[in-house]
């Protein structure tokens, strides 16, 4: 018997130069797809003898409802607690959760989104990586009507729903607390300046200084990467200033723990030097 290769949706998509979800919708006359592309897809399917796999279709119909989640990591307490909340809520509402990590990589983030779309998840919840400055892979989800909710590190808030804490107010309150307790030179350690969350928290810090009529000193604001080692380097940079700060506001737990270690180590070295 002749061993014939069955034409797949992937074959049709490659021939048409579109994505697999797009050609699938075109074959179903989706109103989201142009009439011209629908006609082309059907004609090509007939020409290439494409036949839908009834077994695969049956599996899809009976598949559990799935939500895809993308986070920078699963080690940080913040993201671990967020994932716990997402999964608990999803299970309570009959959904299954697929968790992926970007490892703070733009390329990993893009690949995760592509994979989740190809898996036909019903929606995606994501926190952007620190490397992400191009949002074309995010805006493309709008074109295929893929529901997306961004949290913590967000973008394109006019197109997608987002969940964020009031970073500006919390940073302002924390800075004010340090000032009220006698600190006069409060430094700020944050992540990369392009991140919206960093902008908001830095704004709150600066606003507290302005309200207290304290001059803003650029050398007291160190924004690097949200990373433990980078946090230690930032703290050591601040402590090496001719006039070091007497308090440090770190924008998250990772940087705060890094700052505490660096301060402790610096004081230990100073003590050993004096002995």
Language-model regions, residue ranges each:
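Central regulatory/effector-binding core of bacterial HTH transcription factors
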Residues: 88-134
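Short gly/ser/thr-rich secondary-structure transition/capping motifs
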Residues: 47-53, 107, 129-130, 260
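Bacterial carbohydrate/catabolite-sensing allosteric modules
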Residues: 1-4, 15, 20, 47, ...
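N-terminal helix-turn-helix DNA-binding module of bacterial transcription factors
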Residues: 1-65, 257
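N-terminal helix-turn-helix/winged-helix DNA-binding helices
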Residues: 2-8, 46-84, 92-95, 103-104, ...
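A short acidic, amphipathic alpha-helical/loop segment
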Residues: 82-85, 112, 136-140, 259
């Amino acid at each position: 018997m002749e061993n014939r290769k069955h034409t797949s949706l992937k074959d049709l998509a490659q021939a048409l130069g579109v994505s697999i979800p797009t050609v699938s919708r075109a074959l179903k006359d989706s109103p989201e797809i142009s009439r011209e592309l629908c006609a082309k897809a059907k004609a090509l399917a007939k020409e290439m003898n494409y036949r839908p796999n009834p077994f695969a279709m049956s599996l899809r119909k009976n598949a559990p409802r799935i939500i895809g989640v993308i986070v920078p990591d699963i080690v940080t307490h913040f993201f671990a607690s967020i994932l716990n909340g997402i999964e608990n809520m999803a299970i309570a509402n009959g959904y299954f959760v697929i968790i992926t990590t970007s490892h703070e990589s733009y390329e990993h983030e893009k690949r995760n989104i592509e994979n989740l779309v190809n898996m036909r998840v019903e929606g995606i919840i994501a926190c952007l990586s620190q490397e992400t400055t191009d949002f074309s892979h995010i805006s493309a989800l709008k074109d295929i009507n893929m529901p997306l909710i961004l949290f913590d590190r967000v973008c394109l808030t006019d197109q997608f729903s987002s969940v964020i804490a009031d970073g500006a107010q919390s940073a302002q309150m924390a800075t004010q607390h340090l000032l009220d307790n006698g600190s006069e030179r409060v430094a700020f350690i944050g992540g990369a300046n392009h991140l919206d969350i960093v902008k908001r928290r830095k704004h709150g810090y600066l606003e507290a200084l302005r309200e207290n009529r304290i001059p803003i000193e650029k050398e007291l604001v160190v924004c690097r990467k949200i990373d433990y080692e980078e946090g230690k380097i930032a703290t050591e940079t601040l402590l090496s200033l001719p006039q070091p700060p007497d308090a440090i506001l770190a924008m998250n737990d990772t940087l705060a723990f890094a700052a505490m270690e660096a301060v402790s180590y610096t004081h230990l070295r100073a003590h050993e030097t004096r002995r």
